[in-house]
């Protein structure tokens, strides 16, 4: 019996290979992780394992708990879930906590790796009943893969073509009911048909200072490092309202404290560590300040197109739009206008530049944003 291999929507007999190795090659696929594991986490012990352990996003958590409890009572599969929001706000954490609440495992996939339907078929056909499939950066899957997911999400089935040429025939493959969790930093790039197939859609917003401080205090205990309340607050202030950044800066301050300050994080130690890392009082790092410097000094405060800023900084627009601009916008340091990006008076002041007394429509741009 010849081996079977996936080729897009086609499943055809594998032709014998003129090599010493067998023609039956194992099918490659993304590894499956339990609900308490995550391949992207440098320090998994900082990641909450259950929804009740999470800090912040209380409205989102409450709605998810209701949906999970209802699905358990009905003995039914949980509806598909879409998370959107800036990076580092907990989309992957939700994707690990939800399976734990359901008592199932989760398989992690990344949108950019799904080049064709054949890349998705092994994962779909190997899912256990009610298992969770998580696709990160789901906005980056190609149209062919997206359309292939429609029947899988709605009817839990996929169409396969067996054989080749005139001998080809369509086979309707029934999938076990599963929950798809998608995560995106660009919800606007999702097509309407795909977006509408998610029964639950949640937007994750930036965290409050109190929530971020609580996260830092909790995680300092997990890292077995002593920290004062003032130091925890200072780290939170400089963490851009983002838990992932807060955890990264906590780790750096911990390393600094253990190396230079007898292993205790005080406000003085936190300030010294963050200043050494070039994190300023607003939480802006070198890249953020370079963006503002480019916009203010090189582009005279704007309005300037994102492509011009990216080219001047020798970086890609996606990085600026996904990782830099969301916090600058929230901090009222820049504006997005129809004519381009504009630096606000607050940005001029923070970067120690004199704001223009009058410019090319500056006042009008500020009034009409």
Question: What positions do the PLM features span?
Answer:
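The conserved phosphate-sensing helix
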Residues: 239-252, 264, 284-285, 303
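Conserved C-terminal helix/linker of AAA+ ATPases
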Residues: 256-278, 288, 343-345
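Pre-Walker A (pre-P-loop) alpha-helix and adjacent loop at the N terminus of AAA/AAA+ ATPase modules
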Residues: 42-80
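AAA+/SF3 P-loop NTPase mechanochemical coupling elements
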Residues: 164-183
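Terminal-proximal interaction/regulatory segments of ATP-powered molecular machines
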Residues: 298-369
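Conserved AAA+ ATPase core "coupling" helix
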Residues: 190-222, 229-237, 248
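Conserved AAA+/SF3 P-loop NTPase catalytic/coupling segment centered on the Walker-B
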Residues: 117, 131-161, 187-197
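Walker A/P-loop
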Residues: 73, 78-109, 124-128
